[in-house]
Regions:
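Secretory targeting and sorting signals
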Residues: 4, 25-58
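Beta-rich, blade/repeat-based domains predominating
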Residues: 61, 65, 102-124, 159-173, ...
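Short loop/turn segments immediately following the C-termini of beta-strands
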Residues: 75-77, 87, 136, 179-181, ...
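Beta-propeller fold detector
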Residues: 93-103, 152-158, 196-207, 253-261, ...
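Blade-level signature of beta-propeller repeat domains, shared across WD40, Kelch, NHL, RCC1
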Residues: 381-390, 394-420
Length: 420
């Protein structure tokens, strides 16, 4: 008895547990993402958001779209939430409300600090003015319309698979990466009424995970190349970087991805340089970054061999101008990198640390960069905090703020952050 993946309807009942774009600015597109399986691919909830906010007069946001905002995904198992913050011109954060997503958070098996074990679980899309969040524990994706720092018009749809953990956006198209089971990517159209399933877009990743995957065998991220011609997925357990060449209509041009062996061990996060022509992949095994060219046919060319930062367990990577910042969860540090005009990547200093580590900033995970590339925000899962840093002219980071009382890593923990 078959299942139509794109309509979401099945002739047999599901036996799963389910009940129901970038953390930072990306070059050559207007999408920001925040880091982290399913039933019918149709809207399953559209309700008034439960929210605690200050009066509207206290917000500096514009009438449409996000403005001076940072969003943090709580990823709570009993009900996922988005914590909104107003961002001052000096980078300091003030709480601006907590919003229920209408889905549940998730926790991958044996995850050490990062419950979703991914990058890109929370995405703000400038073009549509929408914030997109995964609900890993209920196999759904939530969209909100953003006004300033406020979230409105919640819509919830099935992710099309098990344990959604990453979202990519290009133009009017979004793809969700499902980490559980065989793993998959599922496409959606971004509309004024939320996400609509894109017929014919579902593609399997051919993995062999449980519905709730192990953190070290789950895929790490899905992302579009800035020109939209390729959709890229990292797989930690298979040690591959897999690419789907895309058609202009937003559908994959191939039934199966082009599989490239990773130059470094355990590929995790994806980022691109300011030109959009070079792809950087963070690799957790030896805390390295490899620079690639993504060819139109999906094959990768190594432009620079893995560069080690001397830290422990690099998993997340974001760009601010010609600088890149990586989160090392093994020893709770942030590394800085700089790319010269020839595309050569190097560390910003000899020790590989962009800012001094802090006892109150433990369990470094996901990062976000503001659209003006002046500030970097870092999640500390063990401490339950977010640190904000000013980007200095030499690439060093100066701490300007700390947001506290966020969900601390335990049975699960926060993961996913976006900055505007």
């Amino acid at each position: 008895m078959g299942t139509d993946r794109d309509s979401g309807y099945s002739e047999h009942g599901r036996t799963s547990r389910h009940s129901g774009t970038r953390r930072g600015h990306r070059a050559k597109r207007r999408t920001r993402r925040i880091v982290l399986g399913g039933g019918a691919l149709a809207t399953v909830a559209a309700a008034t958001v439960a929210v605690t906010v200050a009066s509207a007069g206290q917000y500096s946001g514009s009438a449409a779209g996000a403005d001076h905002a940072v969003f943090v995904q709580g990823n709570e198992l009993d009900g996922n939430t988005i914590h909104a913050f107003a961002r001052g011109d000096d980078g300091k954060l003030k709480p601006a409300g907590t919003y229920e997503t209408g889905g549940k958070g998730g926790d991958q098996i044996d995850a050490p600090t990062d419950s979703l074990a991914s990058q890109g679980s929370l995405v703000y899309d400038d073009r549509s003015g929408m914030l997109l969040a995964v609900n890993a524990g209920s196999g759904t994706v939530t969209s909100f319309r953003v006004e300033g720092q406020r979230l409105k018009d919640r819509k919830v749809v099935s992710s099309g698979g098990e344990f959604p953990s990453s979202i990519a956006v290009h133009g009017k198209t979004a793809y969700v990466m499902n980490a559980g089971g065989e793993g998959s990517v599922q496409g959606f159209r971004i509309t004024g009424k939320g996400l609509k399933p894109l017929k014919g877009s579902y593609r399997s990743l051919g993995l062999d995970n449980e519905d709730i995957p192990r953190f070290d065998t789950s895929p790490g991220e899905v992302d579009f190349t800035p020109d939209g011609r390729n959709l890229v997925v990292t797989t930690k357990g298979n040690n591959t970087v897999e690419v789907f060449p895309m058609k202009r209509n937003g559908l994959p041009a191939v039934a199966e991805p082009v599989v490239n062996e990773s130059a470094g061990g355990v590929p995790f996060a994806i980022s691109f340089d300011a030109t959009g022509k070079r792809m950087l992949v963070a690799e957790a095994e030896k805390s390295t970054v490899t620079t690639y060219k993504v060819n139109r046919d999906g094959k990768l060319k190594v432009l620079q061999q893995p560069l080690a930062n001397g830290q422990e367990t690099l998993c997340w990577l974001e760009r601010a101008g010609n600088y890149f910042y990586g989160g090392n969860t093994g020893n709770s540090t942030v590394s800085g990198y700089v790319m010269d005009k020839h595309g050569k990547l190097s560390l910003t200093n000899d020790v590989g640390i962009a800012t001094p580590p802090s006892a109150n900033s433990q369990g470094v995970i996901d990062l976000a960069v503001t659209e003006d590339e002046k500030f970097v925000y870092v999640q500390n899962a063990v401490s339950g905090t977010v640190d904000g840093f000013r980007v200095e002219s030499d690439g060093a980071l100066t701490k300007v703020t700390t947001a506290e009382d966020l969900p601390v890593f335990g049975e699960s923990g926060m993961e996913g952050i976006a900055a505007v």
